[in-house]
Amino acid sequence: HKYLQDRDSLVDAETNIYTKREGEDITVRCYLTFSGSRKLLCKETCEEGNILIDTYRDEDQRGRYSIKYEHRYIRSSILDVTITKLTKSDSGLYRCELQKDWCPDSEDNFKIIVTEGEFNPQNHEDISIQPFRKSTFKE
């Protein structure tokens, strides 16, 4: 089974990437294939030391990290992940995971890139989304 060997590159291709500036908050929605009682939010992998949240509750918070779980349908649920006051060290790969005794684990990955530049809500203007026009620079 080739796709098992290429699993890492497969995950890579499907990983959503979010870019934010230092100081901003972010909420990312993880889509999971079944409902599960144990919810985990991890950095990189869900190994000891990488687990940010490990809970059986539908809503939980640990410091700057919080999750909100919603069971949608028999084979579908969502986990909203919020990280507040982002820092450069928050950049990286994250994993949402649902665990159930008699089911395989369900997981979703996302990547955050935190760019430099203090976020200031008062004068925040995202110039990156404005089209470049020469007429802006009239003499």
Which residues make up each language-model segment?
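Non-cytosolic beta-sheet module surface loops
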Residues: 30-34, 85
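Type I single-pass or GPI-anchored cell-surface glycoprotein architecture
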Residues: 1-6, 115-139
